[in-house]
Amino acid sequence: MAFCDSIKLEKGMYSVSGKGFTQVLEELDPSENYKGTPMENLDAYQRQLKRFGIKVNGPGCDKVEKFFSAPDSAVLFPEFISRAIKKGLEACDILPSITAAHTFIDGIDYRTISSATETYNESTMGGEGKLIRAVNVTTNDSLIKLQKYGRLFSSTYEALRFQNLDVVAIIFKQIGMDIAYEQLGNAVSTLLPGTSETDAVENASTLGTLTYADLLKLWAKLSPYQPNVMIANADTVKDILSLSNMQDAQAGLAFHGTGHLVTPLGAKLVVSDKVEAQKILGIDKNFALQMIQSGGVTVEYDKVIEKQLEKASVSMTVGFSKIFKGAVKVLNYKSTSQPGG
């Protein structure tokens, strides 16, 4: 009998500080002990599924009630939900493409840092030592507000018990995608320049009509940063894609190969309704945004294990902070003329 078959599963395994359920299982039943065995490609959680004969996908996929055929196996169901939600988060791969750093913390309060390089006047530079400018790194005064993103179940166990696990997993995966898009909206809102950041906005030469020259102005405005991501709402993205320069063969090949829209400048196009019409947010993804996350995907495991699904919730706690303001610029090509004027 393999050691994984003797582990006593308890719901308290979900409440270990700073560790997920699978991490706790791995400490009890390390995967490295299974090298050279038929289970070497399974992690500790997957070995528990195998132990109880629970098949979560493919031919012969089990139904939800299989998890609840024994008290120990019921403990595995919250992790099943969590993994499906994580797949949905990963399927929406936009956040990683606009985030420079993803920081994990244990608490709910986080204070960011900022840096400023001292300026110099070339005419007053004297000896060689004065060529080295100081960089002042300070802690910001205000805390980053982390927000909880989640969903509350309204379905009962009886409504789900005879449903195939692969179908139920798709439902939770879609929940994960929804949460990811909500996070994307707040990330973009964080990136948008505030009212005091007037130097972050570049007005187009011909208001109301987007030209390729305007995109070049945005590219130049971001220097010395690189505009590798452009964010706009759906109508504005249509304007960008309508430019003759967007008929570039390389851009077309990139879209067919990856599913990602890119400009001839090499910048990825991201659609977000948080950006006003006829405005384009250009960022350098390597310097613009920090994502702060407290813990992982949280499932109300005690309620799920007790089959009280209609009262259970899933959530994750995340916040965003702009790192370098200079790595974010806005192109505005909105017409200022008034109707009838």
Which residues does each predicted region cover?
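Short helix/loop capping segments that flank catalytic or ligand/cofactor-binding pockets
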Residues: N121-S123, Q163-N164, D239-L241, K322
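Extended, solvent-exposed, turn-rich assembly/linker loops in the middle of proteins
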Residues: P193-L261
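Glycine-rich, charged/polar anion/phosphate-binding loops
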Residues: T139, D214-L218, G296-V299
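Assembly/oligomerization interface modules of large self-assembling protein complexes
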Residues: K63-Y149
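Helix N-cap / beta->alpha transition motif
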Residues: T156, A232-T236, D284, I323-F324
